[in-house]
Amino acid sequence: MAYQGRYNNKPSGKARGGAWKIVLIVILCVVLLLGLLLGAAYFYLESKLNKINRATFEEKDVSGQDLSALIGNLDESDPTISISETTAPTQAPTEPDYGETGKMINILLIGQDGREGEEAKLADGIMLFTLNKETRTLTTTSFLRDSYVKLPENYRGHTCGWNRINTSYALGYAWYGSAGAMEMLNLTLENNYGVKVDGNIELDFSAVVKIVDAMGGLDIELTGTEYTKMLEHQQRLNTQYETLGISWYRWIDIHEGVNNLNGDMVLAYARERHIDNADSDIKRTVRQRKVINAMLSKLVTLSPSELNNVIDTALSLVTTDLTTDEMKTYILELTPYLFDLKLVSNQCPAEGTYWGEMVELPDGVGGVLKIDFDANKRILQAVMNGEEVEGTAIQ
């Protein structure tokens, strides 16, 4: 009989089949585990997004008297803001050519000046977030609220003429509620700058305070004049609390340089426009972008439990016109870029493309910013495409 060496033994078909069974079982277990994790993540995301308030259209019977509280005296039967053609600036072409979903995602953040329990009013802050997936850039563009723009010519039967950009939000809200405010502001941006907004997020003053506090405050660097102004603000708040009979106030020690500011202080910092004689709405929007960047920087440092608390707090305080499916799509698109984004700060109108002028407004003569819309449309497109433009700040 031929010698059968130990290296000549072949595994039986039964043994080979058993090995394959083990491999298949392992693969099946991995697939099931991934399925469970994805399912849990899906339901987690769904439960969180369901906490967000939804913008709704509410047709309102608004008199000229009610509108005058927001923007001045208007005729009750025809709420038209008229301005002569000789004083109306040239408007840019209205055909939008960027900012649609695909290469870019545009989400508009609206900070409105209504406080908790109050009706929403003017848009105190208008900030556009543009994610460019090709250049991995997140651009934050602040729109100056005194910008003199053409409002939609015929918004659901209402004609509006020319006015400050934040009035667009106020009129939309007065006529059709939160969804109307967002829609009218979006149309105003598209008609004047060619910007296509994919979705809106709105929050009021009280929301900012609560969200920042949930994050444990924000690290903000104060200049000497900013420190002086913030100290005055703390003293005013403390006096107000005492007047109301509230025995506590979250007094914090601040100084020139980097400070961890609580929600009250961050809100005051972001809204202040008279820190010194040279201060203006332009510097105010710079401070607002600094706050946003500080929030983004803080978020990535939070533990899972801290982040979950911030998410729960924030989602219940904001209002959006996005559907749950749209939000999930944008979140999934954003996630791969979250830790590898170049942040760019931008202002619209850009420096050198606008000038101050006194014009006739519904509530009398007022100062506005007249704008070279063609130049700003070109600059916006360049910045959103990831090009370096003088006057923008890259981080």
Question: Where is each model-derived feature located?
Answer:
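N-terminal Sec-pathway targeting helices
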Residues: 14-31
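Non-catalytic, solvent-exposed segments at the cell envelope interface
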Residues: 2-10, 20, 37-395
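Alpha-helical transmembrane segments
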Residues: 30-38
